[in-house]
Protein backbone atom coordinates (compact mmCIF):
# COMPACT_ATOMS: atom_id res chain seq x y z
CA UNK A 1 0.00 0.00 0.00
CA UNK A 2 2.86 2.40 0.73
CA UNK A 3 4.50 1.78 -2.65
CA UNK A 4 1.12 2.37 -4.33
CA UNK A 5 0.87 5.70 -2.50
CA UNK A 6 4.32 6.72 -3.71
CA UNK A 7 3.47 5.76 -7.30
CA UNK A 8 0.19 7.70 -7.11
CA UNK A 9 1.60 10.81 -5.41
CA UNK A 10 4.53 11.08 -7.82
CA UNK A 11 2.50 10.18 -10.92
CA UNK A 12 4.67 7.13 -11.53
CA UNK A 13 7.86 8.86 -10.38
CA UNK A 14 7.52 11.89 -12.67
CA UNK A 15 6.57 14.67 -10.20
CA UNK A 16 7.97 15.69 -6.81
CA UNK A 17 10.52 12.86 -7.05
CA UNK A 18 13.99 12.96 -5.53
CA UNK A 19 16.67 10.54 -4.40
CA UNK A 20 14.79 9.73 -1.20
CA UNK A 21 11.67 8.81 -3.19
CA UNK A 22 13.60 6.24 -5.19
CA UNK A 23 15.42 5.02 -2.07
CA UNK A 24 12.08 4.47 -0.32
CA UNK A 25 10.64 2.62 -3.32
CA UNK A 26 13.76 0.44 -3.57
CA UNK A 27 13.57 -0.34 0.16
CA UNK A 28 9.90 -1.31 -0.16
CA UNK A 29 10.65 -3.50 -3.18
CA UNK A 30 13.48 -5.27 -1.32
CA UNK A 31 11.07 -5.77 1.59
CA UNK A 32 8.65 -7.58 -0.71
CA UNK A 33 6.38 -4.89 -2.18
CA UNK A 34 4.66 -6.36 -5.23
CA UNK A 35 4.85 -4.04 -8.25
CA UNK A 36 2.28 -6.11 -10.17
CA UNK A 37 -0.17 -5.72 -7.28
CA UNK A 38 0.46 -1.95 -7.36
CA UNK A 39 -0.29 -1.86 -11.09
CA UNK A 40 -3.50 -3.86 -10.59
CA UNK A 41 -4.55 -1.54 -7.78
CA UNK A 42 -4.21 1.43 -10.16
CA UNK A 43 -6.29 -0.13 -12.95
CA UNK A 44 -9.64 1.36 -13.95
CA UNK A 45 -12.74 -0.56 -14.94
CA UNK A 46 -13.79 -0.70 -18.57
CA UNK A 47 -16.58 1.86 -18.03
CA UNK A 48 -14.17 4.43 -16.57
CA UNK A 49 -11.60 3.78 -19.29
CA UNK A 50 -14.16 4.29 -22.07
CA UNK A 51 -15.43 7.46 -20.36
CA UNK A 52 -11.87 8.83 -20.14
CA UNK A 53 -11.19 8.21 -23.82
CA UNK A 54 -14.47 9.88 -24.78
CA UNK A 55 -13.26 12.98 -22.93
CA UNK A 56 -9.89 12.79 -24.69
CA UNK A 57 -11.64 12.75 -28.08
CA UNK A 58 -13.06 16.20 -27.24
CA UNK A 59 -9.62 17.76 -26.68
CA UNK A 60 -8.34 20.67 -28.72
CA UNK A 61 -5.12 22.66 -28.47
CA UNK A 62 -5.28 26.27 -27.33
CA UNK A 63 -2.02 28.16 -26.75
CA UNK A 64 -0.03 24.98 -25.98
CA UNK A 65 -2.77 23.76 -23.65
CA UNK A 66 -5.12 20.86 -24.26
CA UNK A 67 -8.72 21.77 -23.45
CA UNK A 68 -11.42 19.08 -23.49
CA UNK A 69 -15.05 20.10 -23.08
CA UNK A 70 -17.46 17.17 -22.88
CA UNK A 71 -21.04 18.45 -22.94
CA UNK A 72 -22.39 16.04 -20.32
CA UNK A 73 -21.66 15.65 -16.59
CA UNK A 74 -18.57 13.56 -15.85
CA UNK A 75 -17.15 11.59 -12.96
CA UNK A 76 -14.60 13.93 -11.33
CA UNK A 77 -11.97 11.24 -10.94
CA UNK A 78 -12.27 10.20 -14.58
CA UNK A 79 -12.10 13.86 -15.69
CA UNK A 80 -8.94 14.38 -13.60
CA UNK A 81 -7.41 11.24 -15.11
CA UNK A 82 -8.23 12.56 -18.59
CA UNK A 83 -6.51 15.85 -17.75
CA UNK A 84 -3.46 13.86 -16.59
CA UNK A 85 -3.50 11.79 -19.78
CA UNK A 86 -3.54 14.89 -21.98
CA UNK A 87 -0.13 15.83 -20.55
CA UNK A 88 1.30 12.87 -22.48
CA UNK A 89 0.69 14.70 -25.76
CA UNK A 90 3.88 16.24 -27.19
CA UNK A 91 3.83 20.03 -26.99
CA UNK A 92 1.11 20.18 -24.32
CA UNK A 93 2.23 22.20 -21.29
CA UNK A 94 -1.09 22.12 -19.44
CA UNK A 95 -4.51 20.54 -19.77
CA UNK A 96 -8.02 21.33 -18.67
CA UNK A 97 -11.20 19.25 -18.71
CA UNK A 98 -14.34 21.39 -18.33
CA UNK A 99 -17.83 19.93 -18.09
CA UNK A 100 -21.31 20.71 -16.76
CA UNK A 101 -22.31 19.35 -13.35
CA UNK A 102 -25.61 17.69 -12.45
CA UNK A 103 -26.69 20.77 -10.46
CA UNK A 104 -26.26 23.23 -13.32
CA UNK A 105 -22.76 24.44 -12.57
CA UNK A 106 -19.54 23.88 -14.46
CA UNK A 107 -16.43 22.11 -13.17
CA UNK A 108 -12.89 22.29 -14.54
CA UNK A 109 -9.96 20.06 -13.65
CA UNK A 110 -6.52 21.40 -14.64
CA UNK A 111 -3.08 19.78 -14.75
CA UNK A 112 0.36 20.98 -15.87
CA UNK A 113 3.95 19.98 -16.34
CA UNK A 114 6.84 22.35 -16.63
CA UNK A 115 6.39 26.09 -16.39
CA UNK A 116 2.60 26.57 -16.54
CA UNK A 117 1.03 27.31 -13.15
CA UNK A 118 -2.57 26.09 -13.44
CA UNK A 119 -3.33 27.38 -9.94
CA UNK A 120 -3.11 30.95 -11.25
CA UNK A 121 -5.44 30.14 -14.15
CA UNK A 122 -7.99 28.41 -11.90
CA UNK A 123 -7.88 31.30 -9.41
CA UNK A 124 -9.15 33.55 -12.21
CA UNK A 125 -12.18 31.23 -12.37
CA UNK A 126 -12.72 31.26 -8.61
CA UNK A 127 -10.86 28.02 -7.92
CA UNK A 128 -7.45 27.04 -6.65
CA UNK A 129 -4.99 24.23 -6.12
CA UNK A 130 -1.28 24.11 -6.75
CA UNK A 131 1.11 24.70 -9.64
CA UNK A 132 0.61 21.22 -11.17
CA UNK A 133 -3.00 20.41 -10.23
CA UNK A 134 -5.91 22.76 -9.71
CA UNK A 135 -9.67 22.99 -10.20
CA UNK A 136 -12.61 25.37 -10.17
CA UNK A 137 -16.36 25.13 -9.66
CA UNK A 138 -18.20 27.80 -11.65
CA UNK A 139 -21.82 28.66 -10.93
CA UNK A 140 -24.18 30.97 -12.79
CA UNK A 141 -22.67 30.44 -16.26
CA UNK A 142 -23.53 28.15 -19.13
CA UNK A 143 -20.87 25.73 -20.32
CA UNK A 144 -20.24 27.93 -23.36
CA UNK A 145 -19.82 31.04 -21.16
CA UNK A 146 -17.50 29.13 -18.81
CA UNK A 147 -15.35 27.98 -21.75
CA UNK A 148 -15.06 31.60 -22.93
CA UNK A 149 -14.05 32.61 -19.40
CA UNK A 150 -11.46 29.81 -19.34
CA UNK A 151 -9.94 30.94 -22.64
CA UNK A 152 -9.85 34.53 -21.34
CA UNK A 153 -8.09 33.33 -18.17
CA UNK A 154 -5.54 31.41 -20.25
CA UNK A 155 -4.96 34.47 -22.44
CA UNK A 156 -4.50 36.71 -19.39
CA UNK A 157 -2.09 34.22 -17.81
CA UNK A 158 0.05 33.86 -20.95
CA UNK A 159 -0.03 37.53 -21.95
CA UNK A 160 0.89 38.88 -18.51
Which stretches of residues belong to each language-model region?
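Hydrophobic helix-and-loop "lid/oligomerization" segment in the mid-to-C-terminal part
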Residues: 3, 8-124, 129-160
Amino acid sequence: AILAGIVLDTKSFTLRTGDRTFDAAAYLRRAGADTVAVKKLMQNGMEQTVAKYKILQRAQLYRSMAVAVPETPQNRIVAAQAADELLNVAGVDASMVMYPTEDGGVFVSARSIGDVNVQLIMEKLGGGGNRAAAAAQINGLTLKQAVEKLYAAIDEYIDS
